[in-house]
Amino acid sequence: MAKTIQAIRGMNDCSPTESLLWQWVEEKVRSVLQTYGYSEVRMPIVESTPLFARAIGEVTDVVSKEMYTFWDNDEQLTLRPEGTAGCVRAAIEHGWIYNNEQRLWYMGPMFRHERPQKGRYRQFHQAGVEVFGIANPEIDAELILLTARLWKQLGIFDHVTLQLNSIGSLESRQNYRSALVEFLQQHTDLLSEEEKERLVKNPLRILDTKNQVLQEVLNDAPKLLDYLDQESREHFSQLCDLLDAVGIQYEINPKLVRGLDYYNKTVFEWVTSALGAQGTVCGGGRYDGLVEQLGGHATCSVGFAMGLERLVLLVQEVNKQIVLPSAVDIYVVYFGEKTTLPAFQLAEKIRTELPHLRTMTHCGGGNFKKQFKRADKVGAKFALVIGETEVKTQQVVVKDLLGGAEQLSLALTDVVIYLKQAITQ
């Protein structure tokens, strides 16, 4: 027997049963985004490597350690580790945002070479939102309201907490960086080798260290909010006032900086304690300088991304009321001479007149017992039975597989009407 080939570590398959939950979550995401008037865009999963180096920052963990990069002839390419850079690139290239506001969203796979664990994978999926051309804090608040509405739709709102911070302008971060480095240099004995490297290259990333002893020390470190420029301070204050006015609770987390270099002013995360170490289910903020940094005209921007794997895990963990649709509504069973054609014609008629129902024709041969067993296995609600007698009498036997009404015989012409009433009840 030939040796089997397995999926790459950290890149997972999704079974038919698991896909039902994924589809349910994705449909909720799409529905909420459409409610707010956002437009879908689609970008390639492979981009030029310099795009991410320029956008995310060469000293970030994502660019320096985690990207899947390869050479194609003389061009260096990368599987996208996140969606914002590619969306900005596309918006500049196609003129979507020149003198124009845009509210865009996308959904798809991303890739990072990380140590796989629950909620963190090498291929993972994100839904992302990017808004261009709106500078005021109202749009920051709208994105947070949008996500809050989605959490309610998913049944997870009571299990997530909103954390907010402002990281100000580049100048204010540089001033804060100097103060933070001066503080941390007094505690270098507590820093790991990786953290010592960050102290030189990207000291703000030390603020989200998992080292509990260092976290305690950082409670006494200078606070970024104390170094904000006046514009960023006013922007953040107005955002907090807006959230207070609409009843969105939040925590101000002075250590929240996000892991990508393009952010400025507002940053936020929705976190949960229900998934262990991988507690962030959504994160984002403003990146007002990124469009210009990538060659476009100066354009204020804000966005977020949510991890779909973590959302699916969280829904499984806390939403016990969810009722997923079955993969099949109607299963057409047929056995005997001259039953195949009527069965196929009936199935096609149902698909034409009731396209919202999922209709499966058996196709596998075997007696009625075998076919009913298969209908039960796929979770069908109704079986439509056509035997030799039904062919002669132009009737169909309808069997409720979920234990409701007893089976009954209907004229072939009445089946669609019956199903329309029975399945919408």
Curated annotation (Swiss-Prot):
UniProt subcellular location: Cytoplasm
KW Transferase (keyword) present: no
Main location: cytoplasm
PROSITE patterns: AA_TRNA_LIGASE_II
Gene Ontology CC: one annotated term: cytoplasm
GO biological process: histidyl-tRNA aminoacylation
Alphabetized InterPro entries for the sequence: aa-tRNA-synth_II, aa-tRNA-synth_II/BPL/LPL, Anticodon-bd, Anticodon-bd_dom_sf, His-tRNA-ligase, HisRS-like_core, HisRS/HisZ, HisRS_anticodon
HAMAP family: His_tRNA_synth (MF_00127)
Name the record gives this protein: Histidine--tRNA ligase
Organism: Histophilus somni (strain 129Pt)
